[in-house]
Amino acid sequence: MGGYKGIKADGGKVDQAKQLAAKTAKDIEACQKQTQQLAEYIEGSDWEGQFANKVKDVLLIMAKFQEELVQPIADHQKAIDNLSQNLAKYDTLSIKQGLDRVNP
């Protein structure tokens, strides 16, 4: 389990967060597509009536909500990627090296 000197961050946990964020993004997109397809299927089916309309409406609301999660999840992935890249560079920063000389 690699860490980053001077920062309480576990490299393995950061990598795990990157993997989980990517999986979450993929799963949300797949779920949104399936929800949308189910709503469209119900709309085109012979199932009619107030209950069918309510089910379709709920599915459309869910699909819209899932669609609205795509951008925040993408932003989250980008933040984790940036964190990972910046943590890897931390020990090479001149200010960090200067602090190490002052406070070994």
From Swiss-Prot:
Keywords, comma-separated and alphabetical: Secreted, Virulence
InterPro entries in UniProt: ESAT-6-like_sf (IPR036689), T7SS_ESAT-6-like (IPR010310)
Record has Manganese as a keyword: no
GO cellular component, one term: extracellular region
Principal subcellular localization: secreted
Localisation per UniProt entry: Secreted
Subunit note: Homodimer. When mixed with EsxA does not form heterodimers.
Similarity field: Belongs to the WXG100 family.
Summary of the function given for this chain in its UniProt record: Virulence factor that is important for the establishment of infection in the host. EsxB is required for EsxA synthesis as well as secretion. Mediates together with EsxA the release of S.aureus from the host cell. Also inhibits host cytokine production and thus modulates dendritic cell-mediated immunity.
Name assigned to this protein: Type VII secretion system extracellular protein B
Organism (species): Staphylococcus aureus (strain MSSA476)
Gene this protein is translated from: esxB
